[in-house]
From Swiss-Prot:
Gene3D superfamilies: ABC transporter involved in vitamin B12 uptake, BtuC. It comes from Bacillus subtilis (strain 168). The chain crosses the membrane at residues 15-35, 69-89, 97-117, 130-150, 160-180, 204-224, 249-269, 289-309, 317-337. The keyword Nucleotide-binding does not apply. Keywords: Cell membrane, Ion transport, Iron, Iron transport, Membrane, Transmembrane, Transmembrane helix, Transport. The complex is composed of one ATP-binding protein (YusV), two transmembrane proteins (YfiZ and YfhA) and a solute-binding protein (YfiY). This is Probable siderophore transport system permease protein YfhA. Coiled coil: none annotated. It comes from the Bacteria. Induction: Induced by iron starvation, repressed by fur. One of its GO terms (biological process) is siderophore-dependent iron import into cell. Its main location: membrane. Belongs to the binding-protein-dependent transport system permease family. FecCD subfamily. It is a multi-pass membrane protein.
Amino acid sequence: MKLRFGVTAAEKKAWIVFLVLLGLTAAVLIISAGLGQRFIPPWDVAKTFFGAGSKLDELMIMSFRMPRILTALCAGVCLAAAGAILQGLVRNPLASPDIIGITGGAAVAVVLLMMFFSDRSSSLTISLSWLPAAAFIGASAVGLIVYLLAYKNGASTFRLVLIGIGFSMSAQAMTTLLMIKGPIYRASQANVYITGSVYGSNWQHVKIAIILSVILLFICFVALKNMNIQVLGEDIAAGAGSAVQRNRFFLLLLSTALTGCAVSVAGTIGFVGLMAPHIARRLVGSSYGALLPASALIGALLVLTADIVGRTLFAPVEVPAGVFTAAIGAPYFIYLLYKTRNS
């Protein structure tokens, strides 16, 4: 059904959902910026953003709280976008970066970097800019190996998922082994990291996360047509003139890059890439023009909310955001397994 000015009812609904999600994200961001040992009311947070707040509020928000908030936002966006791409790529609702091993590969690479290039104060002895590089290399290596092992007259989506799950388990074992064999002061740092936490984020983390996120999301929107074609299946995509295997490999690489970006700044926050695309698909449908931005905003909301809960529920003790996303995501994964048991 077309409305006036050529806008379909589905497009109008997608725009409404997008604006609501954008408003919710802004609201959660403001609430998060006000929470901590010193509570700052939302209106004072808003005044601070516009340069009219007190010096103390500005110090608390801009120096200590905003870096972790923006890091959480970027991590959620990247993980959700990666999950949306993977689910369309393999046409399997259970696909996500953490389930098929991509997140695990990134985590192993980053933990290795931490083990070899950190001092007794758990501070890195190299630039933070090496973390995204290590995460991307680890994620890409696992993604490439999974793709090659699944390739037989074309990469089978079913084999991709099965082999990916095996690599995910192997990556977890490798990370645990590194923590056991490494010095205790490095193991404790790595443990917080692999649980998924934005604690200790600074503006250098934010700079890296924002630059990489913007570049990768721009590439995602350029590749929207390829994403929509891949969802149709190999035969239809090939009939439409798409280079199926080349596009599949490119989208897998894009997903690994998004995952590497998120893991490098926030650790392995699980199940965001699984849940966000499912929720978005129910709200806006399966067209990637609407699905991708909706998934990204839902992913940001999930990680921001998990970080708020982790900071406040057991205060003054902070619980990593990944603990709460896993607490929600694991039952959701079981629900999806049950729902798709006959598929």
